[in-house]
């Protein structure tokens, strides 16, 4: 047997091992990236559901003739601001996340003020549609928490 075949065989084997290892790392990175994108999509879906419910809730509350217009306006403006902020999970920066979180916090705080001021309107509290929307909103807040937790867990992998 020729002596030069052994070193060539070893080199070819090492190249093959490195190639397979590189492909494995690339595939794992792609799977991780896709999982992060999927979880971010779930977060956005939960926030979109909340925004849709807020629109329905505001329309129901508008039916109360003497309801505080400033509270409704604050909710509508916060919702508009939150829906204008979008993030691409593959190119996310800490500044974008901070802006997104600030917009969502604005929605949460104005929505909390709305729900507190509703306590002063017994007819509105007795409105079946309003109560249903309030329950759905609470459920959606739980979905948001779950989606954000799963996203954070996936990013840490």
Model segments located where?
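A helix-centric hydrophobic-segment signal that preferentially recognizes long
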Residues: 1-157
């Amino acid at each position: 047997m020729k002596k030069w075949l052994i070193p060539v065989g070893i080199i070819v084997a090492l190249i093959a091992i490195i190639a397979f290892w590189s492909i494995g790392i690339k595939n794992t990175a792609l799977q991780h990236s896709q999982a992060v994108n999927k979880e971010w999509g779930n977060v956005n879906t939960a926030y979109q559901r909340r925004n849709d419910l807020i629109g329905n809730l505001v329309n129901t509350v508008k039916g109360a003739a003497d309801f505080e217009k400033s509270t409704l306006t604050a909710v509508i403006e916060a919702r508009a601001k939150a829906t204008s902020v979008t993030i691409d999970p593959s190119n996310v920066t800490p500044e974008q996340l901070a802006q997104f979180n600030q917009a969502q916090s604005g929605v949460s705080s104005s929505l909390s003020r709305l729900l507190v001021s509703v306590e002063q309107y017994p007819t509105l509290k007795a409105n079946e549609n309003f109560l249903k929307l309030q329950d759905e909103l609470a459920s959606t807040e739980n979905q948001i928490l779950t989606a954000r937790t799963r996203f954070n867990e996936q990013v840490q992998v």
